[in-house]
A protein has these predicted regions:
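A short helix-turn-beta junction within AAA+ P-loop NTPase domains corresponding to the substrate/partner-engaging
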Residues: 26-43
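Intrinsically disordered, low-complexity regions enriched in Pro/Ser/Thr/Gly and acidic residues
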Residues: 134, 142-146
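Conserved RecA-like P-loop NTPase ATPase core
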Residues: 12, 37, 77
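A short beta-strand-to-loop transition that corresponds to the Sensor-1 phosphate-sensing loop
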Residues: 13-25, 43-46
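Conserved AAA+ ATPase small/helical "lid" subdomain
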Residues: 41, 46-137
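Terminal-proximal interaction/regulatory segments of ATP-powered molecular machines
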Residues: 147-357
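Single conserved hydrophobic/aromatic residue that forms the stacking wall/gate
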Residues: 2-4, 8, 12
Length: 357
C-alpha cells in the first residue's frame, strides 16, 4: 500500500522595520530561513485624516487622554508626518499631492494638481516606505504636551518649536533636514496663520457686531447714492459727499476683499437690501444676512492689525468697554477649544506674524 503522509504546515507572521529586515537578510546564516519568507511591504499611512485617527487612539489610551489639545494640533502633526513619507511629484506641489491623497478635490484650487492615480503612478510601488514613523510622531506629541511646565497641553505653535528642535537633534542627512524645514516654513506655518486667523477673526467679530452693522449701513447708503449719482449729506455732521468722495469711501471697504467689479457689486448689494427692507418694516437687514457683503466687511474689519489690538491683546485696556470686549473674545476662544493660556500665546504669536508680513 502506498502511504501518503500529510505534513501540517504553519504560517508565522511577523513585522519588522525596513532597516532591521535588511540587516537580517544580509546575514548569510539566515539564507535557508529567508528562502521560506514571503515579504509583504506595508507602507506608512499616507492619508492625513487616518494618521490623525491613529494619534487620537494613542492619546485615548495614554496618560495624556485628559490633557488639553488645541484645535489643529493633531492635524498639523499628521500633515508633517505624511509629507515626510511622500515622494515629491513633478510639476506639482507635494502639499497638493498630500491633500489629494486625503480625498480633497483641488480642481478649482490648484490647476497643477493631478489625480490620485497619476500621483500613485509617478511615485512607484515603494512610496510610504520611508519618512517619519507614527511612533516618532507620538514622541513629538508627548514633548509638545510637556513643553510648557505650567500647563500640560498641546498647541500648534509649540508643535512647530518642538519639530524644529527635533529636526536639528536627530542629525538627519543635510538634504532631508532642509526638506523638513521647508515643509514647516512653506506649508505648515502659512496654513496655520490662515487657520488661527480665522479662529481669532470669528471670536473677534462677535465682539464687534455693532461695528459690523454700522459699516454695513454706511456701505449701503453710500452705494445707493453713488448709483443714483447724487450727493449725500451726513445727518450727524452735515458733511456733504459728492460721487467721488462716496466712491473713495466705498473703495476703502472693498479694497481688502479685492472686489474686481465694484459697480456690479454695489448694484447687487443695494438691490438685495431694498428687497430685504420690504420684509423688515423698512429697516436694513442684519449685516450677517448677505454673505458676499459680510465677507467684505469682515476683511475690512480684520485688515488692520492695529484695530485688533484693543480686543485681542492682553495689555491693559483703556476703557471698560475694551476690557469687556476682550473678556468676551477670550471666552469665545475658550468655547472653541483653547485654554486661556493658549488664547494669549496664539493671539500674540498671530499678531507678531501679521506685523512681520
Amino acid at each position: 500500500h502506498l502511504s501518503i503522509r500529510r505534513q501540517r504546515q504553519m504560517c508565522i507572521r511577523d513585522s519588522s522595520n525596513e532597516a532591521e529586515w535588511h540587516t537580517f537578510k544580509n546575514n548569510k546564516n539566515n539564507e535557508a530561513f529567508i528562502d521560506r519568507v514571503y515579504i509583504v511591504k506595508v507602507p506608512y499611512c499616507l492619508r492625513v485624516t487616518e494618521e490623525m485617527q491613529i494619534y487620537e487612539k494613542l492619546l485615548r489610551n495614554s496618560s495624556l487622554r485628559d490633557a488639553h489639545c488645541a484645535p489643529d494640533t493633531l492635524h498639523m502633526l499628521a500633515q508633517f508626518s505624511t509629507l515626510t513619507r511622500l515622494k515629491e511629484p513633478e510639476n506639482s506641489s507635494i502639499y497638493s499631492k498630500m491633500r489629494v491623497y486625503d480625498g480633497e478635490n483641488l480642481k478649482d484650487v490648484d490647476p497643477h494638481a493631478k489625480s490620485m492615480q497619476e500621483y500613485h503612478d509617478m511615485a512607484g510601488v515603494d512610496e510610504g516606505m520611508n519618512g517619519l514613523s507614527t511612533r516618532f510622531a507620538f514622541k513629538i506629541l508627548s514633548k509638545v504636551f510637556n513643553y510648557d511646565h505650567s500647563e500640560v497641553a498641546a498647541n500648534p505653535v509649540h508643535l512647530i518649536h518642538v519639530l524644529e528642535q527635533r529636526i536639528d537633534q536627530e542629525q538627519f542627512p543635510q538634504e532631508r533636514q532642509e526638506q523638513y524645514r521647508r515643509f514647516i516654513k512653506e506649508y505648515l506655518v502659512p496654513r496655520y496663520v490662515e487657520f488661527i486667523g480665522k479662529e481669532i477673526q470669528t471670536a473677534y467679530l462677535e465682539s464687534y457686531s455693532e461695528y459690523g452693522q454700522n459699516i454695513f449701513d454706511r456701505y449701503v447708503t453710500y452705494a445707493d447714492f453713488w448709483i443714483q449719482d447724487q450727493e449725500f449729506r451726513d445727518p450727524d455732521t452735515g458733511e456733504i459727499f459728492d460721487r467721488q468722495a462716496l466712491n473713495e469711501d466705498l473703495e476703502k471697504i472693498e479694497k481688502p476683499a479685492g472686489i474686481s467689479n465694484p459697480k456690479d457689486f454695489r448694484n447687487e448689494v443695494v438691490n438685495f437690501v431694498l428687497r430685504a427692507r420690504a420684509n423688515n418694516h423698512g429697516k436694513n437687514p442684519s449685516w450677517l444676512s448677505y454673505q458676499k457683503l459680510r465677507d467684505v466687511i469682515e476683511k475690512k474689519m480684520f485688515s488692520n492689525t492695529e484695530d485688533l489690538l484693543p480686543v485681542i491683546s492682553f495689555n491693559a485696556k483703556g476703557s471698560e468697554d475694551d476690557q469687556r470686549k476682550h473678556n468676551n473674545f477670550v471666552q469665545r476662544m475658550v468655547s472653541r477649544g483653547y485654554t486661556e493660556k493658549q488664547v494669549r500665546l496664539l493671539s500674540e504669536w498671530y499678531l507678531r506674524v501679521r506685523k512681520a508680513q
